[in-house]
Amino acid sequence: MHCPFCCAVDTKVIDSRLVGEGSSVRRRRQCVVCHERFTTFEVAELVMPRVVKSNDVREPFNEDKLRSGLMKALEKRPVSSDAVENAISHIKSKLRATGEREVASKSIGSLVMDELKKLDKVAYIRFASVYRSFEDIREFGEEIARLQD
C-alpha cells in the first residue's frame, strides 16, 4: 500500500484487529521510508446477485428499492430504523447465501414478507396486499387468517 504522506510504495503492518463483529479488519501501518503511521480498514467486497423481474428484465440489486418497499409498508408503524436495517441485512445475507448470480424478484418479495411478518403484522398485510395483488376484502381476510394460525 502506498504511503499517504510521502507516496512511498512500501509500508508495513504494525497491528491488525477485527472490528464490526468481525466483518472488517483495522490495520495500523507504518511507512518504511518516512516512518509515518496511518490506519486502514479492510472490508470484503460482497457481490449481490442480479434481479430477474417478472417480465424477464434483469437489473442490478438495488438496496434503496428494498429499503423503500419496507419503509412504505412500515409507514406510521412503531418499528425502529435499526430493526429495518437489520431486516435489510438479513435479506441481503440470504440472497448472497444462495450463491446464485441471478435471483427472481419474487424470491426477494418472499424474503421481505418473512422479515415483515417478524417485525409488524400490519406492515406485513400492507406489503402482502400489493405484492400478491389483492383484489377484494376476502383476500385480505384469508391472509389475516393465515397470519393468525
Curated annotation (Swiss-Prot):
Transmembrane segments: none
Cofactor annotation remark: Binds 1 zinc ion.
Keyword Nucleus among UniProt keywords: no
Domain ATP-cone: start-end pairs: 49-139
Mapped zinc finger ranges (unnamed): 3-34
Molecular function in Gene Ontology: ATP binding; DNA binding; zinc ion binding
Domain of life: Bacteria
Cofactor(s) recorded in Swiss-Prot or TrEMBL: Zn(2+)
Record GO biological process: negative regulation of DNA-templated transcription
NCBIfam families on file: transcriptional regulator NrdR
Recorded family membership: Belongs to the NrdR family.
Function: Negatively regulates transcription of bacterial ribonucleotide reductase nrd genes and operons by binding to NrdR-boxes.
Protein name: Transcriptional repressor NrdR
Annotated source species: Erwinia tasmaniensis (strain DSM 17950 / CFBP 7177 / CIP 109463 / NCPPB 4357 / Et1/99)
Lineage summary: Bacteria, Pseudomonadati, Pseudomonadota, Gammaproteobacteria, Enterobacterales
